Amino acid sequence: MEAEGMLPPQSLSAKFEGSFAYLTVRDRLPTILTKVVDTLHRNKDNFYKEYGEEGTEAEKRAISFLSRLRNELQTDKPVLALTDNAEDTQAWNEYMERQQDLMENGQLVSWFKSPWLYVECYMYRRIQEALYMNPPMHNFDPFKEGKTQSYFESQQAIKYLCTYLQELITNMENMTEIQLRENFLKLIQVSLWGNKCDLSISAGQDNSQKLSPIDSLPDLQRFILVDDSSMVWSTLVASQGSRSSGMKHARVDIILDNAGFELVTDLVLADFLISSGLAKQIRFHGKSIPWFVSDVTKQDFEWTIKQTMAANHKWMSASGVQWKHFMKEGTWSYHDHPFWTLPHEFCDMTVDAANLYSTLQTSDLILFKGDLNYRKLTGDRKWEHTVRFDQALRGFQPAPLCSLRTLKADVQVGLQAGHAEKLSTQDPDWMTNGKYAVVQFSSPHREQ
């Protein structure tokens, strides 16, 4: 736990004019809302065909709701309590009250004055409220089109990756531990760089992967600022016991980020972990509602496996069939606890989602994918870049964990002294352009 009396640094916020948080709230969030409105409008004929006049009226009401929301955001209006009586409504409204208690000089919680992490998460929850409040549309995913497009536009890279995976599986029994480690490290890096494909950062523009992911790795190595991959490997090897005896049933939890190509890289890594015996069980954690434009929902997860099974490519199809089998037999499982779509820092989990924390404590390794998970791990705060990753977690230590993240927000810890300054000179946007990455590991058993 963090030292008693030590206050964490300030939250990143749009109140710091000119900051990345400010530019995101001012420019990118309204753009995303506009795209959601456009998506609803383009689907109005489908709503009418499926639900008749009720669908048409629901679409109009949702668009009106979202247009008001965009105005509230752009004019820095106070944040409003949710009114949709969903499973998480009370948790959201209680969190708003907590934020209000932190405001100074009688100010109200608002878009440009409150923590960026909170208001950005809140925007996506309000989009969901617009759908919840108009029942025929409550299951509509306004981001589905972009996610499926990302998958299809990355077909060539997916073919390369599935072919590579199937070759590995064919030769698995003859692999030495050195070869196994080498291929594990490659697939960790593929999963890491798969995170570059983030539609919320590009505000929904094409951000697909078209090159061979494996061939790209040597050129990308120098952009990894912290690489704790070897510690991840050591943790897995220690947790599974002897490879031949298979005495321990190691479980890996993967906290997913983006659908499309990135999800495929995660599935390939998970397949390798099972097929190699490095893990006996994989638990995937996704989002229960459409989230941050490209995040994985249960529908995206199932759709991706189904599409890969149906591919007109031998090794893609073989991979999809195997993944379906893993799900059916329970080797893989998908979970979407509501905490993942709350605005909380992960250090709040012990109190605000104790059941989820208890579940994660039984894991042998937790992989946190992507930028938003990193922001929640570190509290999205103005940490010094040299602060240890363990310290920035502020006591969140359910099990050995690793963040696989390409940098898309101006929070980064665990760097050597002088490294951030050197990067700022070479590339002023190094924290936000998705060009750099980290593989950062922390364990409750690790010596500090």
From Swiss-Prot:
Its cofactor is Mn(2+); Ni(2+). Automethylated. A motif (Subfamily III RTxK motif) lies at residues 405-408. It catalyses: beta-D-fructose 1-phosphate + H2O = D-fructose + phosphate; beta-D-fructose 6-phosphate = dihydroxyacetone + D-glyceraldehyde 3-phosphate; L-glutamyl-[protein] + S-adenosyl-L-methionine = [protein]-L-glutamate 5-O-methyl ester + S-adenosyl-L-homocysteine. Its EC number is 3.1.3.-, 2.1.1.-. The keyword DNA repair does not apply. Keywords: Hydrolase, Manganese, Metal-binding, Methyltransferase, Nickel, S-adenosyl-L-methionine, Transferase. The keyword Nucleus does not apply. GO terms for biological process: DNA damage response; methylation. Transmembrane segments: none annotated. Gene3D superfamilies: 1.20.930.60, Uncharacterised protein PF01937, DUF89, domain 3. GO terms for molecular function: fructose 6-phosphate aldolase activity; fructose-1-phosphatase activity; metal ion binding; phosphatase activity; protein carboxyl O-methyltransferase activity; protein-glutamate O-methyltransferase activity; S-adenosylmethionine-dependent methyltransferase activity. Substrate binds at D257, N258, D371, L372, N373, Y374, R375, K408. Subfamily III proteins have a conserved RTxK motif about 40-50 residues from the C-terminus; the threonine may be replaced by serine or cysteine. Metal-dependent phosphatase that shows phosphatase activity against several substrates, including fructose-1-phosphate and fructose-6-phosphate. Its preference for fructose-1-phosphate, a strong glycating agent that causes DNA damage rather than a canonical yeast metabolite, suggests a damage-control function in hexose phosphate metabolism. Has also been shown to have O-methyltransferase activity that methylates glutamate residues of target proteins to form gamma-glutamyl methyl ester residues. Possibly methylates PCNA, suggesting it is involved in the DNA damage response. This is Damage-control phosphatase ARMT1.
